[in-house]
Amino acid sequence: MFVKLFCSLVTESEFVLDFITSNRKQGLSKAPRINMACDRMQWGAEPWQYADLYMPDDESPYQKGGNIPCVMLIHGGFWKEQYTSELMRPIAEDLAEAGIAAWNIEFKRWKEGDEGVWMDTLSDVMRAWGQLALLPNIDVQRSMIMGHSAGGHLALLLAAKAERKPWLAIAQAPIADLIAADQSKLS
């Protein structure tokens, strides 16, 4: 599904097209794997302010000047506490296997009784995007964001508000109309 979405949204990028083509031939659903190694990095003082960095094991075919592109992944789950960045781990692993770094972030989520959390959530996502620029061997000019559901909403907000714009922003099934989502009792 991820590869098909990438294919329908992006047609100009050589490295994205290569990624799509190679994964179509191989299929994303290989034998079940043991969790790929990643580096967990705390980027803030709160326990939820961390990201897992997945880097290719081998030299990336997308390397330019020693740096590779990175996709910052923002998970969905209606901003609720029980949904974590673990939802995006398979995509992070697939990207790293294809030669693209993945920065799978966590952010503040709400639990029953919380109010006004979404502004903290947006702050977390903006801060994580800033931290991505400090990572070694990352090509910031070709770095992207991708979010699903609530993460898609956050990806759209980040793309609109960030001073350093992502090369590409992908919002998978974003919650783009918060009023309609609330009226429909989606969360």
Describe each PLM feature range.
Residues 10-63:
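N-terminal cap/lid segment of alpha/beta-hydrolase-fold proteins
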Residues 59-66, 71-94:
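Short, surface-exposed "cap/lid" segments of acyl-processing enzymes
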Residues 78, 108, 175:
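Catalytic metal-binding/acid-base residues of hydrolase active sites
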Residues 82-91, 103-141:
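Catalytic nucleophile-loop/oxyanion-hole region of alpha/beta-hydrolase
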Residues 100:
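Short phosphate-binding/catalytic loops that engage adenosine nucleotides
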Residues 127-186:
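Primarily recognizes the serine-hydrolase "nucleophile elbow" in alpha/beta-hydrolase
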